[in-house]
Protein backbone atom coordinates (compact mmCIF):
# COMPACT_ATOMS: atom_id res chain seq x y z
CA UNK A 1 0.00 0.00 0.00
CA UNK A 2 1.37 3.38 -0.97
CA UNK A 3 2.06 5.68 1.97
CA UNK A 4 1.73 9.43 2.11
CA UNK A 5 4.95 11.42 1.85
CA UNK A 6 6.07 13.32 4.97
CA UNK A 7 8.84 15.90 4.86
CA UNK A 8 9.91 18.99 6.78
CA UNK A 9 11.11 22.35 5.50
CA UNK A 10 13.77 23.12 6.57
CA UNK A 11 14.85 19.50 7.06
CA UNK A 12 17.68 20.36 9.46
CA UNK A 13 17.53 22.53 12.58
CA UNK A 14 20.19 23.85 14.90
CA UNK A 15 19.65 23.25 18.61
CA UNK A 16 17.71 26.16 20.08
CA UNK A 17 17.13 27.71 16.65
CA UNK A 18 14.04 29.91 16.35
CA UNK A 19 12.35 29.67 12.97
CA UNK A 20 9.15 28.78 11.16
CA UNK A 21 8.91 25.04 10.51
CA UNK A 22 6.67 23.54 7.83
CA UNK A 23 5.55 19.90 7.95
CA UNK A 24 4.31 18.92 4.51
CA UNK A 25 1.99 15.94 4.15
CA UNK A 26 1.50 14.80 0.54
CA UNK A 27 -1.50 12.49 0.31
CA UNK A 28 -1.38 8.95 -1.03
CA UNK A 29 -5.12 8.47 -0.50
CA UNK A 30 -7.92 11.05 -0.58
CA UNK A 31 -9.20 12.52 2.69
CA UNK A 32 -12.88 13.55 2.90
CA UNK A 33 -14.17 16.77 4.41
CA UNK A 34 -14.37 16.48 8.21
CA UNK A 35 -11.21 14.37 8.46
CA UNK A 36 -9.38 14.96 11.73
CA UNK A 37 -5.58 15.28 11.76
CA UNK A 38 -3.73 15.21 15.08
CA UNK A 39 -0.14 16.48 15.32
CA UNK A 40 2.17 15.32 18.13
CA UNK A 41 5.50 16.99 18.97
CA UNK A 42 6.53 13.91 21.02
CA UNK A 43 7.71 16.12 23.87
CA UNK A 44 7.41 15.74 27.63
CA UNK A 45 7.57 19.36 28.75
CA UNK A 46 11.21 19.44 29.81
CA UNK A 47 12.96 22.80 29.40
CA UNK A 48 15.20 21.23 26.77
CA UNK A 49 12.31 19.90 24.66
CA UNK A 50 10.85 21.44 21.52
CA UNK A 51 8.92 24.61 22.36
CA UNK A 52 5.18 23.98 22.57
CA UNK A 53 3.27 26.40 20.28
CA UNK A 54 0.09 28.35 20.99
CA UNK A 55 -3.16 27.93 19.04
CA UNK A 56 -4.25 31.57 19.28
CA UNK A 57 -3.37 33.12 15.91
CA UNK A 58 -3.72 36.64 17.28
CA UNK A 59 -0.35 36.09 18.93
CA UNK A 60 2.58 37.33 16.87
CA UNK A 61 4.97 34.43 17.51
CA UNK A 62 5.16 30.71 18.19
CA UNK A 63 1.78 29.54 16.95
CA UNK A 64 0.62 26.40 15.17
CA UNK A 65 -1.86 26.17 12.32
CA UNK A 66 -2.52 24.13 9.17
CA UNK A 67 -2.63 25.43 5.62
CA UNK A 68 -4.75 23.88 2.87
CA UNK A 69 -3.49 23.61 -0.75
CA UNK A 70 -5.42 26.75 -1.73
CA UNK A 71 -4.01 28.73 1.18
CA UNK A 72 -6.92 28.46 3.62
CA UNK A 73 -5.82 28.57 7.27
CA UNK A 74 -7.10 25.96 9.75
CA UNK A 75 -6.79 26.79 13.44
CA UNK A 76 -5.61 24.06 15.80
CA UNK A 77 -7.37 22.73 18.87
CA UNK A 78 -5.11 21.75 21.77
CA UNK A 79 -5.88 18.21 22.97
CA UNK A 80 -4.62 17.52 26.53
CA UNK A 81 -2.46 14.43 27.02
CA UNK A 82 -2.58 12.52 30.31
CA UNK A 83 0.50 13.05 32.51
CA UNK A 84 2.07 15.31 29.88
CA UNK A 85 2.05 19.13 29.94
CA UNK A 86 2.49 19.24 26.16
CA UNK A 87 -0.82 18.83 24.28
CA UNK A 88 -1.41 17.35 20.87
CA UNK A 89 -2.90 19.59 18.18
CA UNK A 90 -5.97 18.65 16.17
CA UNK A 91 -7.17 20.03 12.83
CA UNK A 92 -10.43 19.37 10.95
CA UNK A 93 -10.35 19.50 7.14
CA UNK A 94 -12.97 21.92 5.73
CA UNK A 95 -13.14 20.11 2.38
CA UNK A 96 -11.87 16.98 0.62
CA UNK A 97 -8.20 16.61 -0.31
CA UNK A 98 -7.21 14.58 -3.35
CA UNK A 99 -4.25 12.26 -3.91
CA UNK A 100 -1.08 14.27 -4.46
CA UNK A 101 -2.36 17.39 -2.72
CA UNK A 102 -0.40 18.67 0.27
CA UNK A 103 -1.57 19.62 3.74
CA UNK A 104 0.98 21.83 5.51
CA UNK A 105 1.26 22.14 9.29
CA UNK A 106 3.15 25.27 10.31
CA UNK A 107 4.83 26.10 13.62
CA UNK A 108 6.25 29.59 13.88
CA UNK A 109 5.18 33.14 13.10
CA UNK A 110 1.44 33.84 12.96
CA UNK A 111 0.01 33.99 9.40
CA UNK A 112 -1.51 37.36 10.34
CA UNK A 113 1.85 38.94 11.15
CA UNK A 114 5.26 39.44 9.47
CA UNK A 115 7.02 36.15 8.67
CA UNK A 116 10.33 36.72 10.45
CA UNK A 117 12.48 34.11 12.18
CA UNK A 118 12.43 35.96 15.49
CA UNK A 119 8.68 35.37 15.66
CA UNK A 120 9.12 31.65 15.09
CA UNK A 121 9.08 28.52 17.19
CA UNK A 122 12.07 27.25 19.19
CA UNK A 123 13.75 23.95 18.36
CA UNK A 124 14.79 21.59 21.14
CA UNK A 125 18.07 22.31 22.89
CA UNK A 126 19.75 18.96 22.25
CA UNK A 127 21.09 17.37 19.09
CA UNK A 128 19.21 14.37 17.77
CA UNK A 129 19.28 12.36 14.59
CA UNK A 130 15.87 11.85 12.97
CA UNK A 131 13.81 13.58 15.65
CA UNK A 132 10.24 12.27 15.10
CA UNK A 133 6.99 14.24 14.88
CA UNK A 134 3.77 12.26 14.51
CA UNK A 135 0.65 12.93 12.45
CA UNK A 136 -2.45 10.83 13.18
CA UNK A 137 -5.23 10.71 10.58
CA UNK A 138 -8.91 9.88 11.20
CA UNK A 139 -10.94 10.01 7.94
CA UNK A 140 -14.17 9.35 9.88
CA UNK A 141 -13.78 12.47 11.99
CA UNK A 142 -14.83 10.53 15.10
CA UNK A 143 -11.46 10.34 16.84
CA UNK A 144 -10.57 6.83 15.66
CA UNK A 145 -6.92 7.34 14.83
CA UNK A 146 -4.74 4.73 13.14
CA UNK A 147 -0.97 4.34 13.35
CA UNK A 148 0.71 7.70 12.77
CA UNK A 149 2.74 8.94 9.84
CA UNK A 150 6.16 10.19 10.93
CA UNK A 151 8.06 13.34 10.02
CA UNK A 152 11.81 13.18 10.70
CA UNK A 153 14.20 16.04 11.27
CA UNK A 154 17.90 16.19 12.16
CA UNK A 155 18.81 18.51 15.04
CA UNK A 156 22.46 19.53 14.99
CA UNK A 157 24.69 21.54 17.29
CA UNK A 158 24.51 25.31 17.03
CA UNK A 159 27.30 27.91 16.87
CA UNK A 160 30.54 26.98 18.66
CA UNK A 161 30.37 28.56 22.11
CA UNK A 162 32.71 26.64 24.40
CA UNK A 163 35.37 23.96 24.47
CA UNK A 164 35.24 21.23 27.12
CA UNK A 165 38.50 19.49 28.02
CA UNK A 166 38.20 16.18 29.84
CA UNK A 167 41.40 14.92 31.44
CA UNK A 168 42.34 12.41 34.13
CA UNK A 169 42.71 14.11 37.53
CA UNK A 170 45.66 11.95 38.61
CA UNK A 171 48.61 11.08 36.35
CA UNK A 172 52.19 9.92 36.89
CA UNK A 173 55.38 11.62 35.72
CA UNK A 174 56.43 10.51 32.21
CA UNK A 175 53.43 8.19 31.91
CA UNK A 176 51.27 8.82 28.85
CA UNK A 177 47.57 9.63 29.02
CA UNK A 178 44.79 10.77 26.68
CA UNK A 179 42.49 13.78 26.83
CA UNK A 180 39.15 14.38 25.12
CA UNK A 181 38.30 17.76 23.62
CA UNK A 182 34.64 18.55 22.92
CA UNK A 183 33.61 21.52 20.79
CA UNK A 184 30.17 22.50 22.07
CA UNK A 185 27.39 25.00 21.47
CA UNK A 186 25.82 26.92 24.35
CA UNK A 187 23.60 23.93 25.17
CA UNK A 188 26.41 21.38 25.41
CA UNK A 189 25.90 19.73 22.00
CA UNK A 190 28.84 18.70 19.85
CA UNK A 191 29.28 21.06 16.92
CA UNK A 192 31.64 22.08 14.14
CA UNK A 193 29.50 25.11 13.28
CA UNK A 194 32.22 27.76 13.25
CA UNK A 195 34.18 29.75 10.65
CA UNK A 196 36.26 27.46 8.44
CA UNK A 197 39.49 29.22 9.37
CA UNK A 198 39.02 28.59 13.12
CA UNK A 199 42.18 27.22 14.77
CA UNK A 200 42.66 26.10 18.36
CA UNK A 201 46.06 26.38 20.08
CA UNK A 202 46.96 23.94 22.88
CA UNK A 203 49.29 24.69 25.78
CA UNK A 204 49.86 23.92 29.47
CA UNK A 205 52.19 24.83 32.31
CA UNK A 206 55.88 24.10 31.65
CA UNK A 207 55.25 23.35 27.96
CA UNK A 208 58.53 23.49 26.06
CA UNK A 209 58.74 26.67 23.98
CA UNK A 210 59.54 24.81 20.76
CA UNK A 211 56.20 22.96 20.91
CA UNK A 212 53.26 24.61 19.19
CA UNK A 213 50.11 22.53 18.80
CA UNK A 214 47.18 23.73 16.74
CA UNK A 215 43.89 21.89 16.26
CA UNK A 216 41.23 22.07 13.59
CA UNK A 217 37.61 21.55 14.60
CA UNK A 218 36.69 18.11 13.23
CA UNK A 219 33.37 17.32 11.62
CA UNK A 220 32.49 15.05 14.56
CA UNK A 221 32.83 17.94 17.02
CA UNK A 222 35.30 16.13 19.26
CA UNK A 223 38.85 14.86 19.16
CA UNK A 224 40.90 12.55 21.39
CA UNK A 225 44.49 13.68 21.89
CA UNK A 226 46.64 10.67 22.82
CA UNK A 227 50.02 10.23 24.46
CA UNK A 228 50.35 13.42 26.47
CA UNK A 229 52.69 13.31 29.46
CA UNK A 230 54.33 15.63 31.99
CA UNK A 231 58.03 15.67 32.80
CA UNK A 232 57.73 16.91 36.36
CA UNK A 233 55.35 16.39 39.30
CA UNK A 234 52.95 19.23 40.05
CA UNK A 235 49.55 20.68 39.21
CA UNK A 236 48.77 21.18 35.52
CA UNK A 237 45.87 22.51 33.47
CA UNK A 238 45.42 22.07 29.73
CA UNK A 239 44.69 25.36 27.98
CA UNK A 240 43.00 25.78 24.59
CA UNK A 241 42.87 29.16 22.86
CA UNK A 242 40.52 29.98 19.99
CA UNK A 243 42.82 32.02 17.76
CA UNK A 244 39.86 33.59 15.97
CA UNK A 245 38.09 34.95 19.05
CA UNK A 246 41.03 34.91 21.51
CA UNK A 247 38.83 33.00 23.98
CA UNK A 248 40.71 30.72 26.38
CA UNK A 249 39.32 27.46 27.78
CA UNK A 250 41.04 25.68 30.66
CA UNK A 251 40.67 22.10 31.88
CA UNK A 252 40.08 20.99 35.45
CA UNK A 253 43.35 20.54 37.36
CA UNK A 254 45.58 17.52 36.83
CA UNK A 255 47.85 16.38 39.65
CA UNK A 256 51.03 14.70 38.43
CA UNK A 257 52.70 12.35 40.92
CA UNK A 258 56.38 11.44 40.92
CA UNK A 259 56.13 7.64 41.06
CA UNK A 260 52.68 6.12 41.37
CA UNK A 261 49.13 7.30 41.89
CA UNK A 262 45.71 5.87 42.72
CA UNK A 263 42.69 6.59 40.53
CA UNK A 264 40.63 9.71 41.19
CA UNK A 265 37.28 8.84 39.65
CA UNK A 266 34.43 11.28 39.02
CA UNK A 267 30.82 10.25 38.78
CA UNK A 268 27.22 10.32 39.89
CA UNK A 269 25.70 7.82 42.30
CA UNK A 270 22.35 9.61 42.59
CA UNK A 271 20.97 11.76 39.81
CA UNK A 272 19.75 11.95 36.26
CA UNK A 273 20.10 14.21 33.26
CA UNK A 274 17.81 17.14 32.57
CA UNK A 275 18.16 16.12 28.96
CA UNK A 276 17.73 12.33 28.94
CA UNK A 277 15.24 10.15 30.80
CA UNK A 278 17.07 7.65 33.00
CA UNK A 279 14.48 4.89 32.92
CA UNK A 280 12.95 4.04 29.55
CA UNK A 281 15.94 5.68 27.85
CA UNK A 282 18.51 4.28 30.26
CA UNK A 283 20.93 3.34 27.47
CA UNK A 284 20.93 6.89 26.07
CA UNK A 285 21.34 8.20 29.61
CA UNK A 286 24.37 5.96 30.20
CA UNK A 287 25.97 7.06 26.93
CA UNK A 288 25.35 10.70 27.82
CA UNK A 289 27.13 10.47 31.18
CA UNK A 290 29.92 8.23 29.87
CA UNK A 291 30.63 9.96 26.56
CA UNK A 292 29.26 13.52 26.74
CA UNK A 293 30.11 14.24 30.39
CA UNK A 294 33.13 11.89 30.63
CA UNK A 295 32.09 10.42 33.98
CA UNK A 296 34.00 7.43 35.32
CA UNK A 297 31.06 5.85 37.15
CA UNK A 298 27.27 6.04 37.37
CA UNK A 299 24.55 4.34 39.42
CA UNK A 300 20.85 3.98 38.66
CA UNK A 301 18.59 5.64 41.24
CA UNK A 302 14.91 5.28 40.35
CA UNK A 303 12.48 5.37 43.26
CA UNK A 304 11.19 1.97 44.35
CA UNK A 305 7.52 2.90 43.93
CA UNK A 306 7.53 5.07 40.80
CA UNK A 307 4.17 4.64 39.12
CA UNK A 308 5.50 4.61 35.57
CA UNK A 309 8.04 1.84 36.13
CA UNK A 310 6.87 -1.62 35.14
CA UNK A 311 8.80 -4.82 35.93
CA UNK A 312 9.98 -4.79 32.30
CA UNK A 313 11.52 -1.33 32.71
CA UNK A 314 13.22 -2.38 35.96
CA UNK A 315 14.63 -5.36 34.11
CA UNK A 316 15.80 -3.09 31.28
CA UNK A 317 17.53 -0.74 33.74
CA UNK A 318 19.34 -3.57 35.51
CA UNK A 319 20.41 -5.25 32.29
CA UNK A 320 21.70 -1.97 30.83
CA UNK A 321 23.63 -1.20 34.01
CA UNK A 322 25.25 -4.62 33.78
CA UNK A 323 26.03 -4.25 30.07
CA UNK A 324 27.70 -0.85 30.48
CA UNK A 325 30.00 -1.87 33.33
CA UNK A 326 33.50 -1.96 31.81
CA UNK A 327 36.76 -1.99 33.72
CA UNK A 328 39.14 0.90 32.99
CA UNK A 329 36.39 2.77 31.14
CA UNK A 330 33.05 3.15 32.93
CA UNK A 331 31.89 1.58 36.21
CA UNK A 332 28.17 1.12 36.81
CA UNK A 333 26.12 0.11 39.83
CA UNK A 334 22.48 -0.86 40.15
CA UNK A 335 20.49 1.08 42.72
CA UNK A 336 17.12 2.44 43.74
CA UNK A 337 15.79 5.03 46.15
CA UNK A 338 13.89 3.99 49.27
CA UNK A 339 11.53 6.57 50.75
CA UNK A 340 10.57 5.70 54.31
CA UNK A 341 9.00 7.44 57.27
CA UNK A 342 10.27 11.04 57.44
CA UNK A 343 12.95 11.69 60.07
CA UNK A 344 12.88 8.09 61.32
CA UNK A 345 14.08 6.64 58.00
CA UNK A 346 14.02 9.41 55.41
CA UNK A 347 15.32 8.77 51.91
CA UNK A 348 18.01 6.20 51.13
CA UNK A 349 19.82 5.46 47.89
CA UNK A 350 20.34 1.69 48.03
CA UNK A 351 23.28 0.45 45.94
CA UNK A 352 23.84 -3.21 45.07
CA UNK A 353 27.59 -3.71 45.18
CA UNK A 354 27.64 -7.10 43.49
CA UNK A 355 26.49 -8.00 39.99
CA UNK A 356 23.09 -6.50 39.25
CA UNK A 357 20.26 -8.28 41.00
CA UNK A 358 16.83 -8.74 39.47
CA UNK A 359 14.67 -6.87 41.97
CA UNK A 360 11.72 -6.44 39.64
CA UNK A 361 9.70 -3.43 40.73
CA UNK A 362 11.01 -3.56 44.31
CA UNK A 363 7.58 -4.28 45.70
CA UNK A 364 9.33 -6.36 48.33
CA UNK A 365 10.90 -3.15 49.66
CA UNK A 366 7.91 -0.83 49.47
CA UNK A 367 6.66 -1.03 53.05
CA UNK A 368 9.49 -2.96 54.69
CA UNK A 369 11.28 -1.02 57.44
CA UNK A 370 14.93 -0.33 56.77
CA UNK A 371 15.95 -2.43 59.76
CA UNK A 372 14.28 -5.49 58.22
CA UNK A 373 15.81 -4.79 54.82
CA UNK A 374 19.28 -4.54 56.35
CA UNK A 375 18.77 -7.70 58.37
CA UNK A 376 18.02 -9.66 55.19
CA UNK A 377 21.13 -8.40 53.39
CA UNK A 378 24.74 -9.53 53.63
CA UNK A 379 26.91 -6.65 54.83
CA UNK A 380 29.09 -5.85 51.81
CA UNK A 381 26.35 -6.65 49.28
CA UNK A 382 24.75 -3.26 49.76
CA UNK A 383 25.57 0.38 50.49
CA UNK A 384 22.75 2.56 51.80
CA UNK A 385 23.22 6.32 51.37
CA UNK A 386 21.04 8.68 53.44
CA UNK A 387 20.05 11.53 51.11
CA UNK A 388 18.49 14.96 51.55
CA UNK A 389 18.79 14.45 55.30
CA UNK A 390 18.16 18.09 56.29
CA UNK A 391 14.81 18.22 54.47
CA UNK A 392 11.90 19.17 56.72
CA UNK A 393 9.46 16.99 54.77
CA UNK A 394 11.64 13.99 53.88
CA UNK A 395 14.71 14.22 56.11
CA UNK A 396 16.49 11.88 58.52
CA UNK A 397 17.38 12.73 62.13
CA UNK A 398 20.34 10.30 62.41
CA UNK A 399 18.79 8.50 65.42
CA UNK A 400 18.64 5.07 63.76
CA UNK A 401 21.95 4.77 61.95
CA UNK A 402 23.45 1.53 60.61
CA UNK A 403 27.20 2.06 60.11
CA UNK A 404 27.75 -1.34 58.48
CA UNK A 405 25.56 -0.25 55.52
CA UNK A 406 25.46 3.55 55.74
CA UNK A 407 29.11 4.22 54.95
CA UNK A 408 28.54 7.57 53.24
CA UNK A 409 25.91 10.34 53.38
CA UNK A 410 24.85 12.67 50.58
CA UNK A 411 25.94 16.11 51.82
CA UNK A 412 24.69 17.93 48.70
CA UNK A 413 22.44 17.55 45.68
CA UNK A 414 20.79 19.97 43.26
CA UNK A 415 18.04 20.73 45.79
CA UNK A 416 20.40 21.87 48.53
CA UNK A 417 23.17 21.10 50.98
CA UNK A 418 22.53 19.19 54.19
CA UNK A 419 25.85 20.18 55.79
CA UNK A 420 24.30 22.78 58.10
CA UNK A 421 21.54 25.40 58.17
CA UNK A 422 21.14 28.76 56.45
CA UNK A 423 21.42 30.46 59.86
CA UNK A 424 24.89 28.91 60.18
CA UNK A 425 25.96 30.24 56.78
CA UNK A 426 25.00 27.35 54.51
CA UNK A 427 25.20 28.93 51.01
CA UNK A 428 23.00 26.18 49.50
CA UNK A 429 20.09 25.82 51.95
CA UNK A 430 16.98 23.76 51.25
CA UNK A 431 14.46 26.52 50.48
CA UNK A 432 11.03 26.79 48.91
CA UNK A 433 8.16 24.32 49.06
CA UNK A 434 10.36 22.24 51.35
CA UNK A 435 12.69 23.73 53.95
CA UNK A 436 15.41 22.62 56.36
CA UNK A 437 15.35 20.73 59.65
CA UNK A 438 18.47 21.23 61.82
CA UNK A 439 18.15 17.69 63.20
CA UNK A 440 19.02 16.30 59.78
CA UNK A 441 22.18 18.30 59.15
CA UNK A 442 25.35 16.33 58.53
CA UNK A 443 27.16 18.16 61.33
CA UNK A 444 24.52 17.05 63.85
CA UNK A 445 24.98 13.46 62.71
CA UNK A 446 28.76 13.71 63.08
CA UNK A 447 28.40 15.16 66.58
CA UNK A 448 26.63 11.92 67.55
CA UNK A 449 29.85 10.07 66.65
CA UNK A 450 28.30 8.59 63.53
CA UNK A 451 31.02 7.82 61.03
CA UNK A 452 30.30 8.39 57.38
CA UNK A 453 31.97 9.89 54.33
CA UNK A 454 30.56 12.50 51.98
CA UNK A 455 29.14 12.10 48.48
CA UNK A 456 27.14 14.49 46.29
CA UNK A 457 24.02 13.91 44.21
CA UNK A 458 22.88 15.53 41.00
CA UNK A 459 19.54 16.64 39.60
CA UNK A 460 16.46 14.56 40.40
CA UNK A 461 12.82 15.23 39.49
CA UNK A 462 11.43 11.81 40.43
CA UNK A 463 9.78 10.49 43.58
CA UNK A 464 9.88 12.98 46.46
CA UNK A 465 11.51 15.57 44.17
CA UNK A 466 8.95 15.44 41.35
CA UNK A 467 6.95 18.47 42.53
CA UNK A 468 10.02 20.63 43.12
CA UNK A 469 10.89 21.23 39.47
CA UNK A 470 7.89 23.45 38.68
CA UNK A 471 7.65 25.01 42.15
CA UNK A 472 9.44 27.85 43.96
CA UNK A 473 11.88 25.29 45.38
CA UNK A 474 15.40 26.69 44.95
CA UNK A 475 17.52 24.60 42.58
CA UNK A 476 21.32 24.55 42.50
CA UNK A 477 23.93 23.02 40.21
CA UNK A 478 24.14 19.20 40.06
CA UNK A 479 26.90 17.83 42.28
CA UNK A 480 29.64 15.29 41.61
CA UNK A 481 31.28 12.60 43.73
CA UNK A 482 35.01 11.93 43.66
CA UNK A 483 36.21 8.47 44.70
CA UNK A 484 39.89 7.66 45.24
CA UNK A 485 40.51 3.98 44.58
CA UNK A 486 43.41 1.70 43.71
CA UNK A 487 41.96 0.17 40.55
CA UNK A 488 39.44 1.27 37.95
CA UNK A 489 37.00 -1.54 38.77
CA UNK A 490 33.63 -1.92 40.46
CA UNK A 491 35.17 -3.88 43.33
CA UNK A 492 37.80 -1.24 44.02
CA UNK A 493 35.25 1.58 43.80
CA UNK A 494 32.98 -0.14 46.32
CA UNK A 495 35.94 -0.83 48.60
CA UNK A 496 36.83 2.88 48.51
CA UNK A 497 33.25 3.86 49.38
CA UNK A 498 33.30 1.49 52.36
CA UNK A 499 36.60 3.06 53.43
CA UNK A 500 35.11 6.57 52.92
CA UNK A 501 37.92 7.53 50.52
CA UNK A 502 35.64 9.96 48.72
CA UNK A 503 34.56 13.57 48.65
CA UNK A 504 31.78 15.78 47.29
CA UNK A 505 31.63 18.89 45.11
CA UNK A 506 28.87 21.11 43.80
CA UNK A 507 29.86 20.12 40.26
CA UNK A 508 33.43 21.25 39.42
CA UNK A 509 36.25 18.70 39.40
CA UNK A 510 38.18 20.24 42.29
CA UNK A 511 41.19 18.11 43.24
CA UNK A 512 41.81 17.89 46.98
CA UNK A 513 43.44 15.76 49.65
CA UNK A 514 43.01 15.85 53.42
CA UNK A 515 45.29 13.97 55.82
CA UNK A 516 46.02 13.80 59.53
CA UNK A 517 49.44 12.33 60.33
CA UNK A 518 49.44 11.04 56.73
CA UNK A 519 46.16 9.12 57.23
CA UNK A 520 43.72 9.94 54.37
CA UNK A 521 40.15 11.14 54.55
CA UNK A 522 37.77 8.56 55.98
CA UNK A 523 40.35 7.29 58.50
CA UNK A 524 39.72 6.55 62.18
CA UNK A 525 42.72 7.33 64.41
CA UNK A 526 43.28 6.65 68.08
CA UNK A 527 45.60 7.94 70.79
CA UNK A 528 45.90 4.31 71.85
CA UNK A 529 47.97 3.49 68.77
CA UNK A 530 49.30 7.04 68.19
CA UNK A 531 49.85 8.74 71.58
CA UNK A 532 51.30 11.82 69.89
CA UNK A 533 47.78 12.76 68.78
CA UNK A 534 47.13 13.87 72.36
CA UNK A 535 49.53 16.73 71.75
CA UNK A 536 49.36 17.50 68.03
CA UNK A 537 47.22 16.57 65.06
CA UNK A 538 49.32 17.44 61.99
CA UNK A 539 46.89 18.26 59.18
CA UNK A 540 48.11 18.49 55.59
CA UNK A 541 47.02 18.19 52.00
CA UNK A 542 46.49 20.08 48.79
CA UNK A 543 43.69 21.75 46.85
CA UNK A 544 43.62 22.53 43.13
CA UNK A 545 40.53 24.42 42.04
CA UNK A 546 38.78 25.05 38.76
CA UNK A 547 38.70 28.75 39.70
CA UNK A 548 40.36 31.04 42.22
CA UNK A 549 40.23 29.53 45.72
CA UNK A 550 38.38 31.89 48.05
CA UNK A 551 38.71 29.97 51.32
CA UNK A 552 39.96 26.57 52.43
CA UNK A 553 38.61 25.76 55.90
CA UNK A 554 39.58 23.05 58.36
CA UNK A 555 36.43 22.11 60.26
CA UNK A 556 36.74 20.60 63.75
CA UNK A 557 33.63 19.31 65.51
CA UNK A 558 31.43 21.32 63.15
CA UNK A 559 33.18 24.66 63.66
CA UNK A 560 35.91 26.41 61.67
CA UNK A 561 39.30 25.65 63.23
CA UNK A 562 41.47 27.46 60.69
CA UNK A 563 40.92 29.26 57.37
CA UNK A 564 43.40 29.62 54.52
CA UNK A 565 42.93 32.49 52.04
CA UNK A 566 44.96 31.26 49.04
CA UNK A 567 44.16 33.98 46.45
CA UNK A 568 45.32 31.36 43.96
CA UNK A 569 43.96 28.31 42.15
CA UNK A 570 46.31 25.99 44.06
CA UNK A 571 47.13 25.43 47.72
CA UNK A 572 49.49 23.08 49.53
CA UNK A 573 48.60 23.42 53.20
CA UNK A 574 49.79 22.32 56.63
CA UNK A 575 48.35 23.04 60.05
CA UNK A 576 49.18 21.77 63.53
CA UNK A 577 46.25 21.50 65.91
CA UNK A 578 48.22 21.65 69.17
CA UNK A 579 45.36 22.19 71.59
CA UNK A 580 45.36 19.25 74.06
CA UNK A 581 43.03 16.66 72.59
CA UNK A 582 41.21 16.08 75.88
CA UNK A 583 40.08 19.71 75.93
CA UNK A 584 38.25 19.56 72.58
CA UNK A 585 36.74 16.07 72.46
CA UNK A 586 33.03 15.44 72.19
CA UNK A 587 31.24 12.96 74.42
CA UNK A 588 29.99 9.81 72.73
CA UNK A 589 26.22 9.34 73.33
CA UNK A 590 26.72 5.60 73.86
CA UNK A 591 29.58 5.83 76.33
CA UNK A 592 32.38 5.01 73.91
CA UNK A 593 35.68 6.90 73.83
CA UNK A 594 35.51 10.71 73.50
CA UNK A 595 36.26 11.80 69.95
CA UNK A 596 37.05 14.66 67.58
CA UNK A 597 36.16 14.86 63.89
CA UNK A 598 37.80 16.99 61.21
CA UNK A 599 37.04 17.66 57.55
CA UNK A 600 38.02 20.13 54.84
CA UNK A 601 35.64 22.63 53.22
CA UNK A 602 36.67 24.46 50.04
CA UNK A 603 34.94 27.51 48.56
CA UNK A 604 35.96 29.00 45.22
CA UNK A 605 35.52 32.60 44.05
CA UNK A 606 32.71 31.36 41.77
CA UNK A 607 30.96 29.98 44.93
CA UNK A 608 31.49 26.34 43.95
CA UNK A 609 32.32 24.15 46.93
CA UNK A 610 33.90 20.84 47.91
CA UNK A 611 33.87 18.83 51.14
CA UNK A 612 36.36 16.13 52.07
CA UNK A 613 35.17 13.11 54.01
CA UNK A 614 35.97 13.42 57.73
CA UNK A 615 38.80 11.95 59.80
CA UNK A 616 38.10 10.89 63.40
CA UNK A 617 40.48 10.88 66.37
CA UNK A 618 39.47 8.86 69.45
CA UNK A 619 40.81 9.63 72.92
CA UNK A 620 41.64 6.23 74.39
UniProtKB/Swiss-Prot annotation:
Family (UniProt): Belongs to the chlamydial CPn_0512/CT_425/TC_0708 family.
Protein name: Uncharacterized protein CPn_0512/CP_0242/CPj0512/CpB0533
InterPro entries linked to this entry: DUF3604
Gene source species: Chlamydia pneumoniae
